[in-house]
Swiss-Prot record:
Name of the protein this chain belongs to: Glycerol kinase 1
Catalytic reaction list: glycerol + ATP = sn-glycerol 3-phosphate + ADP + H(+)
Entry keyword Amino-acid biosynthesis: no
Keyword tags: ATP-binding, Glycerol metabolism, Kinase, Nucleotide-binding, Transferase
Pfam family, one: FGGY_N
Residue numbers binding ADP: 12, 16, 265, 308, 409, 413
Subunit architecture: Homotetramer and homodimer (in equilibrium).
Residues annotated to bind sn-glycerol 3-phosphate: 12, 82-83, 134, 243
Stated regulation of activity: Activated by phosphorylation and inhibited by fructose 1,6-bisphosphate (FBP).
Biological source species: Clostridium tetani (strain Massachusetts / E88)
Gene3D superfamilies per UniProt: 3.30.420.40
Amino acid sequence: MAKYVMALDQGTTSSRCIIFNERGLIVSVAQREFKQIYPKGGWVEHDPMEIWATQFSVATEAMAKANIEASEIASIGITNQRETTIVWDKRTGLPVYNAIVWQCRRTAQICDELKEKGLTETIRNKTGLVLDAYFSGTKIKWILDNVAGAREEAEKGNLIFGTVDTWLIWNLTKGKVHVTDYSNASRTMIYNIHELKWDDELLEALDIPKSMLPEVKPSSYVYGETNSTLFGSSIPIAGVAGDQQAALFGQMCHQEGTAKSTYGTGCFLLMNTGEKAVKSENGLLTTIAFGIDDKVEYALEGSIFIGGAAIQWLRDELRMLKDSPESERYATAVEDTNGVYMVPAFVGLGAPYWDPYARGAIVGLTRGATKEHFIRATLESLAYQTYDVLNAMREDSGIDLKALRVDGGASANDFLMQFQADILGVPVQRPEVIETTALGAAYLAGLAVGYWKDKKDVAQNWAISKTFEPDMIKERREELLEGWHEAVKRSMNWEKSE
């Protein structure tokens, strides 16, 4: 009897493997970082062979650490950095170019050309996404246009495309399976999220041959099994979701109106909107959350560019902190920020402002402002930005949030989580297992093979470590938010456009 489920968590800076038991608890973890490649300013690449090598090595390491055989693993779930684009030769299995990472801005000009052709609204209506270099479509076009011989080989049917999940499955099955799931397909900018198919009009606009594209399947589904030479015997590959969608599933946000926020370098907020795709009027993305039980659920997504990175800035550039956890001690040493607001718009502002020309600002300084006030204001900025995104979600969906579920590094900061609850006016729930991304992938994989019976079965595993109840009067909350919005205004449109 298989006792465990394995999650492969392929992130932007490292590959991890976590093995979970039936209660959703961690049995074993292995992690390996890999190289970031920056060929030019604004360009970011990874070596696809290194992605595969690190991911395979951590899987074998996690099994060895816990003394687990392949026969004891019920299934494998995969969660991955989204949008990152790989094109390879299906005859040799070798990439024709490095993986172009989601952060890479090299295709901004292709996006401008599509805007000039009047495709902004078409893309928005069909894919739920804003026209941006972030997504995979323009990255595929760039590889076909710029790698010698790539377009000819693609047109002959020899080259295939995949996001990172697809690349891992191809390698795990030794080239037998070319597949992705709904959540990853919905981040390519060439997938119609309403009709659930690759979109011919968008493929034509980007000049991408349809033969390159993987088959799209539900997020909880047996896609194939690992080649038996890899782990000693074959294991079903049965769950796939992009990292943020996997975290939404792992946080048990299975009902319409439930939401989670991941506090990492940036912050990612997703709200489950059920079986309807809500079009945003506030600059949020409409995306597929997951496909499970023969139905597709949608989500609204908002991203905050600078979250935990603002605390790293205090530590590394300003040298105000020895380590990030120390920020909590300083922030709680004062009663408030003494009127100081910090807007961390270091690279512009994301949702709902979308101002690339905004820059970081500190306002409200007086002679009485201290280091403690400054650190507290920086922490508070994460909560204010989260409020802005959730408020936009409420306006778009008409759904009032009942509670916010949190994960990621900065969710361990009790001061920040309490302030978040105060500013939102709803409880903030931090679960016992904060590795929710890997957990979500494990749940999707376990459900597909009957390791867990149904969503109710996995929901029983979800346990709250701590709930932060709002404890601020409405007038004070409104006063603080008014100050924040005034500060944001002053940071906007600072950098001159070229």
